[in-house]
Amino acid sequence: YVGGKISPEMETPKLLWLKEHRREIFDRAGQFFDLADFLTWRATGDLARSICTVTCKWTWLAHENRWDADYFRTIGLSELADENFARIGQRILAPGTPSASGLTEQAAREMGLPVGTPVAVGLVDAHAGGIGTVGVEEGALSNLAYVFGTSSCTMTSTAEPAFVPGVWGPYYSAMVPGLWLSEGGQSAAGAAIDQLLAFHPAAEEA
């Protein structure tokens, strides 16, 4: 469910690198997070993970509601499977679901908000933009999101899974609940635009 190939941008290659090159850090780490899940934990103390993050970046099989232990053992991360995935997520929640607890006292104090303020489970940044297709005329099934930043992502939702070689996904409920997500993109889109602008004759005057 990753277009036939794992990208080095995904999290399991990063964890394998950490294990092979910084083993003491890998062994000591209590948890491994995607940024969105880290921010939820930092605000609430809740270790729950988002379907969006773990499905798109960590190989969680959302349509089967499980991790694939064989995959982790095959690539050399058997420790995570042996631990029943305690360090990468055992409670997986849909984006927008309130975390088990609201803001902690420390987080509330730091943000100037009431203790217990609800905090929703998050999404990967591009997917937070892509979910806007739900509000467009004719809805998510008829529109493709093109989200730009440092990278660029194209995302489209389908009612049934679509397997396309080289296209990430299909991911179930990773962006729009109940729909399958397929995505592609260009990691260096922002840098490419900067380079293009640098070629302009008036670039030094800008």
Residue ranges and their predicted role:
Residues 1-48, 57-84, 93-206:
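Active-site core segments that coordinate phosphate-bearing ligands/cofactors
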Residues 51:
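Conserved redox-cofactor binding core of oxidoreductases
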Residues 54:
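Catalytic DNA-binding helix-loop module of base-excision-repair DNA glycosylases/AP lyases
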Residues 88-89:
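Core-facing hydrophobic residues within beta-strands of well-ordered domains
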